Amino acid sequence: MSWDDAIDGVDRDTPGGRMPRAWNVAARLRAANDDIVHAQQADGLPAYAELHCLSDFSFLRGASSAEQLFARAQQCGYSALAITDECSLAGIVRGLEASRATGVRLIVGSEFTLVDGTRFVLLVENAHGYPQLCGLITTARRAASKGAYRLDRAEVQAQFRDVAPGVFALWLPGAQPQAEQGAWLQQVFGERAFLAVELHREQDDVARLHVLQALAQQLGMTALASGDVHMAQRRERIVQDTLTAIRHTLPLAECGAHLFRNGERHLRTRRALGNIYPDALLQATVELAQRCTFDISKISYTYPRELVPEGHTPTSYLRQLTEAGIRRRWPGGITAKVREDIEKELALIALKKYEAFFLTVQDVVRFAREQNILCQGRGSSANSAVCYALGITAVNPDETRLLMARFLSEKRDEPPDIDVDFEHERREEVLQYVYSKYGRERAALAATVICYRGKSAVRDVAKAFGLPPDQIALLANCYGWGNGETPMDQRIEEAGFDLANPLINKILAVTEHLRDHPRHLSQHVGGFVISDEPLSLLVPVENAAMANRTIIQWDKDDLETMKLLKVDCLALGMLTCIRKTLDLVRGHRGRNYSIATLPGGDAPTYKMIQRADTVGVFQIESRAQMAMLPRLKPAAFYDLVIEVAIVRPGPIQGDMVHPYLRRRQGREEVNYPSPAVEDILKPTLGVPLFQEQVMELLMHAADYSEDEADNLRRSMAAWRRGGDMEQHRTRVRERMQGKGYASSFIDQIFEQIKGFGSYGFPQSHAASFAKLVYASCWLKRHEPAAFACGLLNAQPMGFYSASQIVQDARRGSPERERVEVLPVDVLHSDWDNTLVGGRPWRSAADPGEQPAIRLGMRQVAGLSQVVAQRIVAARTQRAFADIGDLCLRAALDEKARLALAEAGALQGMVGNRNAARWAMAGVEARCPLLPGSPEERPVEFEAPRAGEEILADYRSVGLSLRQHPMALLRPQMRQRRILGLRELQGRRHGSGVHVAGLVTQRQRPATAKGTIFVTLEDEQGMINVIVWSHLALRRRRALLESRLLAVRGRWERVDGVEHLIAGDLYDLSNLLGDMQLPSRDFH
């Protein structure tokens, strides 16, 4: 059924047409350009420019994207289109891109409603007006909380006082026009103030037209036509109505006057406009549009220059810092190749005038290092020899094959991308340094556009259509889980919905339309934009949700289009873990290391990695990575670079993984069609695993220039989003055939290139991450107690819960020592987990003894750091005499007392949990007494049973140092003939087994075609279970909801990789009672 069928009931030409009789729309909306009624282009139709139009960046108001609006404007023959989102320029860059694509001229503007109700639109006339508009939006947004704005007349007048306005103002009179509002606008903007006549085929249109024309004449203002456009086409009215209901948090049936009376707020044909407005009002729109000559693509931008000391230019100062870095990084001197790379890069940086950008990033990194905040550059910037010399990145050009064009290119007219990771717990210090260094008027975070996805859209839409909460949840679950092999209609019917029901039909249709529709702005994870001038002259700035944060209204793609430079200050939990671990090793073990000085090429570390003993380490801790490690068997640093990169969608979909492994294992011969190809692909055995290899391959085998190769690399990402790669296939084929390469090799290489469209790593990025992989693995192998302790203190982060980290540390392995873990105790614990006992490291021959970990009070649920610090401070002064003394001197409230009792943290003072609960219950009566006063004879309490203790441990601390829950259930498991996981070691490949365990992880990789990977844990270890899509659908509830899952299946053991192929699943969670266990699902 077409979208047009949905509006058959609308009285299109009758004034006051209210609602369609039936919204019987298809389950999917067509693309925006389908079935558009093309405007007649015959002579005699009036020219028109739409000057008041909201895009979907007027959140929950505008129903159409800029692309849809400009396509419609082009088809209707408009001379120009103004995007006037409410107090926002968030969608204007998309408007610029759509304008370029269609040839319809863009006018920059914004709509405002003052606190007194006055409504108007400002349109930018020239380069003077644009910063005025940005400044006004910034003023309004900074005066309110995130997502809102506040503006009054005084602030408008202040913005334009003593300056010639570079904007035009369109007054938007209300239903009962108040001449005073128009007179005020005229007072502020003079002859630049216009009266917008907006007619929408309502009963009073004729009378309203006469009233507004008379009012314009009375005020001496020019009247012009305007559409108050909220959608590209009438057919999108159902979407606009739904957005209105969502915005007002009301069901559609109760929205009443909040909804527009009809669907006329769309881009109407010029014939329709000619039938509504007098010619003079239409002509006035064109004349005003012609006066708006501002081109937003021409805005100028200068990076901060105050970092350049007197007597230097940006070029000379960058050179000085680079040369100093060269002496520090290469004390014995650099190779001729590295010198050549640095000189070439410095020349290109100067040509592109990026010196100030590099100086700014270097300054941020310098600050972090001075504050002992670990940081490291990543991404394509690790291809930069200059970044390495400046200390921004950690990848030595001598160690890896760098390709500068991946990072910086003469022909690529976009800024370089420098990403720097900082400790996640201390990154805020870095962000606040940037704010303090440059001021909030010159530094702000980039925005991220939060868009509807299927699940969030259907929730909001179904609620707007009045579905009850239980049905909304059922419908949302259809979007939240499933695989592409199962049609959505089938999932919805299986959930109990009737697709013949018109209401369900409508909900699904609008949901599909709202997929990827902008919902609101959020802040980028760390992308800073810094300017030499106030940012609000370039782009509006508004408040973020977090205190002391401000964001601009453009996202990273907008910044790229507008050629504004962004510094990415990102947060990485593993850096926090490593820094805390190194501090513990230094303080407790006497070994003073940094990431750079850890012993390299350590055989025991690589042996541990090859056994996939990598719980908690960086990057190679996932089950997919663990399954790869015994097959790839990393034995050197470059092997880790490959390991990081190979378990990615790009190499998997490009069929690169298995050929590489076969060649590495000697099962497949490696042949190179030419010496040039061998030089490029030999490190990866003839398989292009990295983006840089693809680019080099094209440059040598297809005579691509650096910039042409980079363009193809960029096309990979565009192809993933629906672009066209075939033009490149033809070009690559012709060029490679011309150089004598066989068609089979060309086709193989091109399919592998296409695989990178599904996300592949640049080698530089993989090498940066591999540095942290090795560091974390070395620490886990040689300092297991410190590493586990640092990992616990850096939570939340990574794949594993505190319980799994502790279980892994206590279990140990053939490659690393077991670690003793001691419980939380108010007599000994600090806030953080700490190391106790052991013997310091003396030498390789005398490594000392591993200390134990004392769990800290940070593990106690419901206990704040402030309370824990009071306990430690009081204990440091003198020992606690009794429970009353503890509560009195540490000022423990009821919540804190209960948390400590439940956590077993009072064991050293009063005994078991039951005794602790009783003791804390009587504290109120005893607190007024002096510490040490005579007390009643203590009551003897029977200790809780083992199961109760374990249950309480998980509830209050999130882990247990007692028996594993599965150990308690082992007798019942034996009765069911369920094996312990250690018993699987003796089973032959392909044998049938029956196991059960606690579910600790569920994963569904995008490349797995619906296959689910589940990790089970018992008292003996962990295993990976593979659940094929057909079983996942059949046993969906057990798979997704079980805490304790039993599996019958086939045990597989190939190339050192062990896993269980599930044949059937069932839920045994009832055996756990109320015990709640953490599981990391689908991350």
Swiss-Prot record:
Regions annotated as coiled coil: none
Record carries keyword Thylakoid: no
Subcellular location: Cytoplasm
Molecular function terms from GO: 3'-5' exonuclease activity; DNA-directed DNA polymerase activity; nucleic acid binding
InterPro entries with a match to the protein in the record: DNA_pol3_alpha_NTPase_dom, DNA_pol3_finger, DnaE2, DnaE2/DnaE/PolC, DNAPol_HHH, NA-bd_OB_tRNA, PHP_dom, Pol/His_phosphatase_N
SUPFAM superfamilies in the cross-refs: PHP domain-like
Function according to Swiss-Prot or TrEMBL: DNA polymerase involved in damage-induced mutagenesis and translesion synthesis (TLS). It is not the major replicative DNA polymerase.
Family under the similarity heading: Belongs to the DNA polymerase type-C family. DnaE2 subfamily.
Name of the protein in its database record: Error-prone DNA polymerase
Species assigned in the record: Xanthomonas axonopodis pv. citri (strain 306)
